[in-house]
Amino acid sequence: MQIFVKTLTGKTITLEVEPSDTIENVKAKIQDKEGIPPDQQRLIFAGKQLEDGRTLSDYNIQKESTLHLVLRLRGGAKKRKKKNYSTPKKIKHKKKKVKLAVLRFYKVDENGKIHRLRRECTGEQCGAGVFMAVMEDRHYCGKCHSTMVFKDDDRP
C-alpha cells in the first residue's frame, strides 16, 4: 500500500509499505529517500507520536494516509552561570512582639482606678486608637498635626 509522509518544509514523500511494517522500517525508508537518520525522526499520525516497536496496523494507518515528519530536538535551554555573591545575605529584621503592650498607655493607681497616660486624638481623620504625643506644655498628634495645650490642673 502507498502512504504519504509530509516533511517540515512542506515536501511530500510517497512510500510503499505493508500494514505489518514497523515504524522503524518506515523511518529506514525515509532515511533512504531523504538522508535523515532514524534517531532524529519523529513520525506523527492523528496527533500521536508513533513509537518504533509498533506496526502501521497498530495505529490504524491505511492506504494513502499521511504521516507528518518532524525532527527531534536535542538538548535544552542554555545553562546559566550560578551567581557568586561577594557579601553574605542580609538578615531580615524580625518584629519583636511585646506581650500586653497596651499596658504602656494606662496606669492603675492604688485605689484600682485606671488612668490613661496618653490622650487619644479627637481629630476627624484620626479617631480612636491614635494617641497624641506628650510634650512639655501640650499634647500633639503626629497624624493630623492638631495640638491641645495643657491647663494648669490638666498636666500629667
From Swiss-Prot:
Disulfide bonds: none annotated. The keyword Nucleus applies. GO terms for cellular component: cytoplasm; nucleus; ribonucleoprotein complex; ribosome. GO terms for molecular function: structural constituent of ribosome; zinc ion binding. It holds the Pfam family ubiquitin. One of its GO terms (biological process) is translation. A zinc finger (C4-type) spans 121-144. InterPro entries: Ribosomal_eS31 (IPR002906), Ribosomal_eS31_euk-type_sf (IPR038582), Ribosomal_zn-bd (IPR011332), Ubiquitin-like_dom (IPR000626), Ubiquitin-like_domsf (IPR029071), Ubiquitin_CS (IPR019954), Ubiquitin_dom (IPR019956), Ubiquitin_ubiquitin-like (IPR050158). Keywords: Cytoplasm, Isopeptide bond, Metal-binding, Nucleus, Ribonucleoprotein, Ribosomal protein, Ubl conjugation, Zinc, Zinc-finger. CDD domains: Ubl_ubiquitin (cd01803). The record marks R54, R72 as: Interacts with activating enzyme. In the N-terminal section; belongs to the ubiquitin family. Ubiquitin is synthesized as a polyubiquitin precursor with exact head to tail repeats, the number of repeats differs between species. In some species there is a final amino-acid after the last repeat. Some ubiquitin genes contain a single copy of ubiquitin fused to a ribosomal protein (either eL40 or eS31). PANTHER family: UBIQUITIN (PTHR10666). This is Ubiquitin-ribosomal protein eS31 fusion protein. It comes from Spodoptera frugiperda (Fall armyworm).
